[in-house]
Regions:
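Short S/T/G/P-rich N-terminal loop/turn motif that feeds into the first structured element of a domain
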Residues: 1-56, 63-73, 89, 96-114
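Short, flexible helix/strand-to-coil boundary loops that buttress conserved ligand/catalytic motifs
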Residues: 72, 81-84
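Nudix hydrolase/Nudix homology domain
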Residues: 83-86, 94
Length: 114
């Protein structure tokens, strides 16, 4: 059963432009370097007004819990995790299955679009 893995990242100080670019580049490499995920998104909040100090969000989907576990152990992910922890990041992670009880509005059928 597929699942969604979401992580919010809070750093004790704002990342520099270079650090933010490095973080994004590391995550952007995952679809090619790690694979395993069916979706990978990363961004910042539009206003920062309601984030309670969490400045970045990572959104991924995996086909099953086995793929998530492989991703978590993958050397490229471990390197990223070490990088954020070196910057005293406080991550907040949430994983849940995607099924009839959690998908409240299905994605539109993109194949039907012109």
């Amino acid at each position: 059963m597929s699942l969604q893995h979401i992580v919010l990242f809070s750093f004790p100080r704002p990342l520099s432009e270079q650090e933010a670019a490095t973080m994004r580049a590391m995550i952007a490499s995952w679809p090619k370097e790690i694979g395993l995920m069916s979706k990978c998104r990363f961004g910042t909040d539009l206003t920062g007004e309601r984030t309670r100090g969490y400045g970045y969000l990572l959104y991924t989907e995996f086909p099953d819990t086995g793929a998530l576990r492989e991703y978590q152990k993958h050397p490229v992910h471990v390197q990223f995790l070490n990088w954020v922890m070196e910057r005293e990041c406080t991550p907040l992670a949430f994983d849940y299955h995607l099924d009839q009880s959690t998908i409240l509005a299905p994605e539109p059928d993109t194949a039907a679009r012109p």
